[in-house]
Amino acid sequence: VVKRLILFCLLFLSGCSKAILQDFSGEIYGTTYSIKIAENSSYANLESKIQNELKRVDYVFSTYKPSSEISLINNDNDLEWSNEFRNLYETSMEISALSGGAFLPKDNNGYDFSAIGKGYAIDKIAELVEQNGVKNYFIEIGGEIRSKGSKFKENWIFGIERPINSKKSPYIAFNVPKDGISIATSGEYREPNHIWGKGPRDLLSVTVAHESATYADAWATALYVLGKDQGLMTAESNGLKVFFILANGDSIQSSNWSMISP
């Protein structure tokens, strides 16, 4: 499942021209990350802490690192799980149960938290920056986000990309609530029939807004797997905030999505 989310932020208000947006960015998990802090004080000391936390989480769920916890467990069923690993597994199984098995943390190759790991890492970075006194931030890893507060009194904004053959605007923009939200998108815009092998599907992408990036990440995958009808039904029964882009470029949303203002 390819995750695509076009992200962008508003320009500064003219009255805040002296304020500096701090941006700590780099590469992790085979993708990029960016942590933006909109405070008048400098938080340069956070950069190394952020990098260390991202690397620490990588050594929990990365299936590409032979020495990661998940790799060691997949090679030794008797290995004791850490509390962190167990929590990821239990959250995965919770989403699996609520989605009728559409989200699975294990396949024939063993445990795999790829569809929940980036969201979990975002939540851990949010905990870190808040513990260090940051109240206004925008965290993005591989197109998934979590934000809180504002960008110098302006809302943070995120955009959902439309398919490349759409005749409508290339993205749909939404304000992020100032009390905080996490956003994750799952989908495939260019070759959905290649991925699924069953001709064109009715659904191109699913975007989930949730208080937790971990849950947003997992739910976006599960609902995309379910497809439009079952996905919308599952979203409604679980009170989720979900925005669907259909194969024809149109969109539908769950009733709770209205809480996310355009």
Regions of interest found by a model, annotated:
Residues 2-8:
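Sec-dependent signal peptide recognition
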Residues 8, 15-262:
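Mature catalytic core of soluble alpha/beta enzymes
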